[in-house]
Amino acid sequence: KNQNIYVKEVATGKEKQLSLDGTLGNYYSAYIRWSPDSKKVASCKIRPVEKRYVYYVESSPADQLQPKFHKQEYAKPGDELPFKVPCIYEVESGRSIIPSTELFDRQYEVYGPEWNPDSRAVTFEYNQRGHQVYRVLELSAETGKVRPLVEETSDTYVNYTRHFRHDLKDGKQMIWMSERDNWNHLYMYNRITAQPDYQITKGEWYVREVLRVDEDNRQIYFSANGMEAGEDPYLIRYYRIGFDGKGLTCLTPEEGMHRAWFSGDMKYLVDVYSMVDKVPVAVLRSARDGKVVMPLETADITLLEAEGWKAPEVFVAKGRDGKTDMWGLIARPTNFGPNKKYPVIEYIYQGPGDQYVPKTFRPYDWNM
């Protein structure tokens, strides 16, 4: 309260103020984390920014003759951003640990902090403005020093929206996702040495998402694309692999775009898969080896086909470099005549941000 951090003794209701310098212009966050040993708390001190506005005139409003003047809150490129400084307070002594900001001073965002299991440090993540540097940092509760556990750098862009981190319970290792070898893969990181012990997944394919980390059985369940040779690299399948990088198992072996839901005990998964020219199929599978336990449903498109519907044709052609496979669709009119000539409408997105070519079955698509 009052922009500061307080603790209250539950039994007596007695309050103790830990921080003394919080103000409206530099306040302590309500994001507060107790250490596992209950002797310390961690939070962030935040320096907010003033609201920024743009102004514009509505020349012809519907309800009056005179123009209207509008003001809208709107941050612009280059504007100052809020600044966060992770901090630690010892509850009994009131000692504060406020670190140097050298390793996280050009902030786009700071995430955390979260306590390490041994209560000796907190871990937080730093996303540098411009997205060319991303760090996992550790703040010592004893010395107040900050050290990097992981650092990702790029001359272009660090894809922070795709990153994944899982700290193992022993506090000695963590699983980290990185594009450092030009593919998105998982690494086992040593938190003591701040170096990767080894790469868990590797190859010319892309880890999409980690669904579950099973520490007891040392297994990772994840989705990926591009692993199967000769297939559209955007088709997603599900896999599991051991912490040691061994025992890679495909849990959804049929060609197609898969979407899976795992049971709470990770023994089974419901898998729904299709392609633009193959109807959706739903099955129950074993999460150990991917074998089908029970078929659930297969879509019936008899009525759709009776109306003349035809599936689009999947094609692959080389890109302008003569090497890269480009996957696309050819959608023909329902009354297509093979002996007629038709104009070709090319609908593409050339940017790097996403892919828009449909991969799953659909009876119609506004793009086609």
What are these regions (language model features)?
Residues V49, Y53, P61-P196, R208:
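Beta-propeller domains
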Residues K1-G25, R106, Y111:
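A conserved hydrophobic secondary-structure block that centers on an alpha-helix together
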Residues L18-R33, S43-S100, R288-L304, Y356-D365:
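Predominantly five- to eight-bladed beta-propeller fold
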Residues T12-K14, S93, T143-K145, T193-Q195, ...:
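Short coil turn/linker residues within repeat-based beta-strand modules
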Residues G112, S119, E125, C250-T252, ...:
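Serine-hydrolase catalytic core recognition
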Residues E15-L20, I97-S100, V146-E151, D197-K202, ...:
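Beta-propeller fold detector
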Residues K1-N4, E9, A42-P48, K76-E80, ...:
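Beta-strand C-termini and the immediately following turn/loop, strongest in propeller blades
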Residues T23-A30, F104-V110, S154-R162, G203-V210, ...:
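Short glycine-/Asp-/Thr-/Trp-enriched loop segments that recur within the blades
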